[in-house]
Amino acid sequence: MSEHLSKAQVKWVRSLQQKKNRDAEGVFVAEGAKCINELRGAFELLLLASPDNASAIEIEQMSSLRTPQGQIAVFRKPTTDNRYPISQLMLALDGVQDPGNLGTIIRTCDWFGIHDILCSRDTADCYNPKVVQATMGALARVRVHYVDLPKALAELKDKHVAIYGTLLEGRNMYEEGAIPNKSEGVIIMGNEGNGISEEVRGLVSHPLLIPSYPAGEATSESLNVGIATAIVLAEFRR
């Protein structure tokens, strides 16, 4: 039986639900045995709360979930120098705001072997507890870089990296030749309501369209960004 958590430790974990406190401490919180076990091999574990050292009430107090998962862990955030190999397929997120969408996208990238995601500064925090929960441990294998996105994309474009963007005026991505090289480049996915920003849109070298079906008939105005990401990545990996 491990030593029972102190009131100060319980209060500390609760405080980490706020981004400013996570940033100040350089830590993040994960919940649930499966997610925690996935992350333990990739991040330094600082604290683990479980029925062995915390009461059900204390776990509920520390949890950010409606239904606590029984275990809560605090991990140290990785130090990142925002360097990444350019000879690979990467994803870029331009202002994706919803934590659930971001978590799903990170998990989808893990499934399709995307190891690096470039995020604009206004994209949701990948260490938000809701994001961490939605990734189901994928953060152990997918690196998330918060960058000046227009600048980063411009530098990649100068190095002759293909910049793909999902746009309504884009080319049907299933057409032959729409994607010259499926193994390299950057795919940009935009904000839930506004899509890709004007500044970033100007850097797209290969605009792509996910066609609706049947062609020419009225459909929903747009796809959820998480679903759209999965559709695009599936085509790139096909």
Task: Map each language-model feature to its residues.
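Short, hydrophobic beta-strand segments that form beta-sheet elements in well-ordered domains
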Residues: 28-30, 44-50, 162-168, 187-190
